[in-house]
Curated annotation (Swiss-Prot):
The gene is ldh. It comes from Thermus aquaticus. Homotetramer. InterPro entries: L-lactate/malate_DH, L-lactate_DH, L-lactate_DH_AS, Lactate/malate_DH_C, Lactate/malate_DH_N, Lactate_DH/Glyco_Ohase_4_C, NAD(P)-bd_dom_sf. Catalyzes the conversion of lactate to pyruvate. This is L-lactate dehydrogenase. Optimum pH is 5 and 6.7 with citrate and fructose 1,6-bisphosphate (FBP) as activator, respectively. The keyword NAD applies. The keyword Membrane does not apply.
Length: 310
């Protein structure tokens, strides 16, 4: 099973490393405009395989993506001093206009897994450029935000995070929506579980957890310049779900016909992920406040994509 990664920077290389550690693929091909960078990362990661799983890691060019079942797109440009978000979006859209056709020429049957930020808008750009069915252009979305939410809830409740079922939906960014109202632990509603555990969730606790999820990327970027290990592991997890036709539920971003009255927008909702990409979208139970917040998030994303002409 071959996986391609276009863009060998922090996120692309961390994803390749996670694929090796998790033993997800049998072959990983790194493609980057900076061929020396791709080659260096491929060689370095290959040397980890004796300690992990037998994965053939190599660098290549677009034609080497032939036969890939998943292509992870982590290509993009860094924000310049004084550059607006919309200007950055426009430059990244230009990058996608170059790379997406090249990917599909080599691997027309692949599922595209979008990692470039802002990921929701870039997922919509990739979908429009590709001409693929929307279910085959999947953004990493709020998988990391959802993981952070579950981890912080688990920490407060003194329970394993794997037993926490809670979602973050909408934008992967400032307008994301933490769905408190339908969160559960072990099949028990969150509030009831917290009371039974003697770990009540006060308004201050909720605010602390919300800030912990919503501001995590800012704290990490302030400390070391970028986030990559968490999203690299998350992208490897999504790749495994696709390659194994797992049909697991993940909060990934997808071009969606309508969300809370906002038409044609890419954002995150819980979705079933399998061999051909997204198989179904699940709408979690939301209270009125969460519904309004999701609508605002959708409007923000719709506006950004529309400003780019996508």
């Amino acid at each position: 099973m071959k996986v391609g990664i276009v863009g060998s920077g922090f996120v692309g290389s961390a994803t390749a490393y996670a694929l090796v550690l998790q033993g997800v693929a049998r072959e990983v091909v790194l493609v980057d405009l900076d061929r020396k960078l791709a080659q260096a990362h491929a060689e370095d990661i290959l040397h980890a395989t004796p300690f992990a799983h037998p994965v053939w890691v190599r660098s290549g060019w677009y034609e080497d993506l032939e036969g890939a079942r998943v292509v992870i797109v982590a290509a993009g440009v860094a924000q310049r001093p004084g550059e607006t978000r919309l200007q950055l979006l426009d430059r990244n859209a230009q990058v996608f206009a170059d790379v997406v056709p090249k990917i599909l020429k080599a691997a027309p049957e692949a599922v595209l897994l979008i990692a470039t930020n802002p990921v929701d808008v870039m997922t919509q750009v990739a979908y429009r450029l590709s001409g693929l069915p929307p279910e085959r252009v999947v953004g990493s979305g709020t998988i990391l935000d959802t993981a952070r939410f579950r981890a912080l809830l688990a920490q407060h409740l003194l329970v394993a995070p794997q037993s926490v079922h809670a979602y973050v939906v909408g934008e992967h960014g400032d307008s994301e929506v933490l769905v408190w109202s339908s969160a559960q632990v072990g099949g028990v509603d969150l509030e009831a579980f917290a009371q039974a555990r003697g770990r009540a969730l006060t308004p201050d606790d909720r605010l602390r957890i919300d800030e912990g999820v919503r501001r995590a990327a800012y704290r990490i970027i302030e400390g070391k310049g970028a986030t990559y290990y968490g999203i690299g592991a998350g992208l490897a997890r999504l790749t495994r779900a696709i390659l194994t036709d797992e049909k697991g539920v993940f909060t990934v971003s997808l071009f969606t016909p309508e969300v809370e009255g906002v038409e044609e927008v890419a954002l995150s909702l819980p979705r079933i992920l399998g061999a051909r990409g997204v198989e179904a979208t699940l709408y979690p139970r939301l209270n009125e406040e969460e519904r309004q917040a999701l609508r605002r998030s959708a409007e923000i994303l719709k506006g950004a994509a529309s400003a780019l002409g996508f």
